Amino acid sequence: MNLDQYLPVLLFILVGIAVGVVPLVLGYVLGPNRPDAAKNSPYECGFEAFDDARMKFDVRYYLVAILFILFDLEIAFLFPWAVTLQQVGMAGFVAVLIFLTILVVGFAYEWKKGALDWE
């Protein structure tokens, strides 16, 4: 097996890693290190921090965020399908209908379980 043909790929990967790592290391080594309490405090538009930055959030915010990402990805999968609708034919149309049916059933399940209720 001739591995010489992979040398440009290896070189490309090494140069890419070096371009990312070398500035980080140089900044860490050569940069000034003068810690100060004001630098370590959170910044809130020029005001003193009102509350602890590590306050707890209700888990429903995370659930809504996950559901948003899920249905946002659904739209991202639908755009290429819509562009190539004429080329994929009936088989592609049926596949997308199955995909949408699964997502609608999942959404209905989340709604029925009360995941979207804020009371």
From Swiss-Prot:
Catalyzed reactions: a quinone + NADH + 5 H(+)(in) = a quinol + NAD(+) + 4 H(+)(out)
Superkingdom of this protein's organism: Bacteria
InterPro entries: NAD(P)H_OxRDtase_bac/plastid, NADH_UbQ/plastoQ_OxRdtase_su3, NDAH_ubi_oxred_su3_sf
GO (cellular component) term, any one: plasma membrane
E.C. code: 7.1.1.-
UniProt main location, coarse: membrane
Gene3D superfamilies named in the record: NADH:ubiquinone/plastoquinone oxidoreductase, chain 3 (1.20.58.1610)
Pfam short name (any one): Oxidored_q4
Single Gene Ontology MF annotation: quinone binding
Membrane-crossing residue ranges in chain numbering: 9-29, 63-83, 88-108
Membrane topology label: Multi-pass membrane protein
Keywords annotated in UniProt: Cell inner membrane, Cell membrane, Membrane, NAD, Quinone, Translocase, Transmembrane, Transmembrane helix, Transport, Ubiquinone
Subcellular location(s) of the protein: Cell inner membrane
Role of this protein: NDH-1 shuttles electrons from NADH, via FMN and iron-sulfur (Fe-S) centers, to quinones in the respiratory chain. The immediate electron acceptor for the enzyme in this species is believed to be ubiquinone. Couples the redox reaction to proton translocation (for every two electrons transferred, four hydrogen ions are translocated across the cytoplasmic membrane), and thus conserves the redox energy in a proton gradient.
Similarity comment: family membership: Belongs to the complex I subunit 3 family.
Subunit text: NDH-1 is composed of 14 different subunits. Subunits NuoA, H, J, K, L, M, N constitute the membrane sector of the complex.
Stored HAMAP family: NDH1_NuoA
Name under which the protein is recorded: NADH-quinone oxidoreductase subunit A
Organism: Verminephrobacter eiseniae (strain EF01-2)
